[in-house]
Amino acid sequence: MKTKFIFITGGVVSSIGKGLAAASLGALLESRGLRVTMQKLDPYINVDPGTMSPFQHGEVFVTDDGAETDLDLGHYERYTSARLSKKSNFTTGQVYFSVIDKERRGDYLGGTVQVIPHITDEIKSKIIENAKGADVAIVEVGGTVGDIESLPFLEAIRQFRFDRGAGNTLYVHVTLVPYIRTAGEMKTKPTQHSVMELRKIGIQPDILLCRCDRELPQDMKKKISLFCNVEESCVIPSVDSEHIYAVPLALNKERLDEQVVEKLNIWTKQPDLTPWQDVVETLRHPSHGEVRIAIVGKYVNLTESYKSLAEALTHGGIANDCRVYLKYVDAEKIEENGVEGWLDDVDGVLVPGGFGERGTEGKVLAIEYARTRQIPFFGICLGMQMAAIEFARNVCGLAKACSTEFKNDCKEPVIHLMEEQKSVNKKGGTMRLGACPCTVTKGTKAFDAYNEADISERHRHRYEFNNTYRELMTTKGLVLSGINQQKDLVEIIELPDHPWFLACQFHPEFKSKPLVPHPLFRAFIGASLTHRNQR
C-alpha cells in the first residue's frame, strides 16, 4: 500500500492539544491494523530542544537512538507501538543547517538558495524519509497558523498534496471553539478566522477537530461547516476529557478514524479498542483507591517538565489498579524550611532528573527522610546521584560527599564527570544519550521488577557513579544491582533492608505506556500501595 500522509495543524491558541490529537489518531489507526509512524515539525531555530530551559520548553523526550526531542514524541510513543528516532522530530534549525551545508558543498550548482524550493524541498524530503515502511504517516506541524515561523512548513505540506495527490494526503486542523460566559454561548469566529488563515496559504482542511469544554451543538457544527467549507460530518468535537487516555475512545465515538480511512480510501478491519476501554475503566474506578506520590524536584512550577514521569506513574497505578495522586514538592522549599511537613502524607517519594546545584540539598534531605522512615523511594538520573551522595554522607560517614557537577574541588566525588565527557566543549547533543544495555543482578528488587537480566534503557546525562567508592558503599550495604558491562558503569542502586529503595541512572519513564506500564513504575507504585495499607 502506498503511504498515506495526514498533516495536523493548529489554530487560535498554542497548547491546543495537537500532540494528543495526533497520538490518539495514531492509536485508532493502529487498532484498525495499520502500520503508523509519527513525526513532529518544530518551527523554532534551535537545532533541538536539548539545551532549552524546561521552564520554556517543558520536557526533553529522548529516543532510543539518542535524539533529544519535543515532548509530543512521548505522547506518540505512549499511544502507539511506534519506536521513534531522530527522523521523527526536526526543527527549522535542522532544516536550515542541512540546506546551508549542501550549499557549501556545492550541491545546488551555484544556484540562488531560497525558501521555495530549497527549504520546502528539504522539509518534504525529511517527511518522506521518516514515512518509509508505514501505511500512514501522521505529521504534526508545531506552532499556530498565522505564526511567521511556521510558514515554510505549511508551504511544504501544501505542496505535498500537489505532489502526492488528494487521495494520499489529508489535512486535519485542530481549533478552538470557546464558551463566552458573559454571552452564555459558544463562539465559532476564532475557528472561522483560523481556517481563513490556513486557506490563504492554500490549505483547505479536510477535517476540523474543534476543542471545546462542553458539547458542541448541532447548529454550531452546521455553522462551522458552512463558513469553513468542511463537510458537516468532518466537523468533529473534541471535548475536554478527565483522562487523556479517554481521548482515543471519544474521537472514535465521533467517527474520526472512520472519516480518515474513508477519505484516504483505505480498507481496514474494525477497530478493537478493548485495551483502551480497560485502561479508562481502571482510571475511573480503581479497585484499590489512591496512593500519594511526592515528586521532589526543581521544575515543579511547570509540571510539563516532568510529563513522561507523571504519565509513567499513572501507568504504574493502572498496573496496580489504583489511582496515583502526584504531590509536587519544591526541593528548594525543603532546603529552606526542612523536610518535616512536606512528606508526612505521602506513600512514596520520587526524586527525578535535573541539572545544576539548585535544590540538590533539599533532595538529599527528602531521600534521607524516605530511607530512614522506610517509605518507598525511587530516584531517576540526578535522583540516583543524590541517593548515592545521601548514602555516602549518612551511612558511610563521608560528610564531604558531593558531585563534581556542583563542586569541581569536591573532597569526596562520589559522582563525577564521565571520562568521555572530559574533552567535550559543546553542550548541544553531547551527553550520553539514548538506549544503552544494562545487566541486572538476580535476587534484587530490580530483577524482581524486570524478571530478566539483560535490559536496555534510555539515558541523558554527563555524570556517573564514581567506581572508586564501590567497595566502601557496598560494604556498608548498598547493592549495585544494574551494571553497564561495556563501560563498567553503575546503572541501578538499591537497599536490600528497605521495603523498596531503588534508583537508576537512566530514564525508565521514556519507555512506559498505558497499555504496557514500565516494570520499575509498576513495582514502585505496588510498594507504595503496600506502604499505604500498612500505615
Curated annotation (Swiss-Prot):
EC number(s) from the headed UniProt entry: 6.3.4.2
GO cellular component terms attached to this protein's record: cytosol
One of the record's GO molecular function terms: CTP synthase activity
Regions annotated as coiled coil: none
Alphabetized UniProt keyword annotations: ATP-binding, Glutamine amidotransferase, Ligase, Magnesium, Metal-binding, Nucleotide-binding, Pyrimidine biosynthesis
Ligand binding (L-glutamine): G354, L382, G383, M384, Q385, E405, R462
SUPFAM superfamilies noted in UniProt: Class I glutamine amidotransferase-like, P-loop containing nucleoside triphosphate hydrolases
Protein function: Catalyzes the ATP-dependent amination of UTP to CTP with either L-glutamine or ammonia as the source of nitrogen. Regulates intracellular CTP levels through interactions with the four ribonucleotide triphosphates.
Miscellaneous comment: CTPSs have evolved a hybrid strategy for distinguishing between UTP and CTP. The overlapping regions of the product feedback inhibitory and substrate sites recognize a common feature in both compounds, the triphosphate moiety. To differentiate isosteric substrate and product pyrimidine rings, an additional pocket far from the expected kinase/ligase catalytic site, specifically recognizes the cytosine and ribose portions of the product inhibitor.
NCBIfam families tied to this protein: PRK05380.1, PyrG
SUBUNIT field: Homotetramer.
Protein name, as recorded: CTP synthase
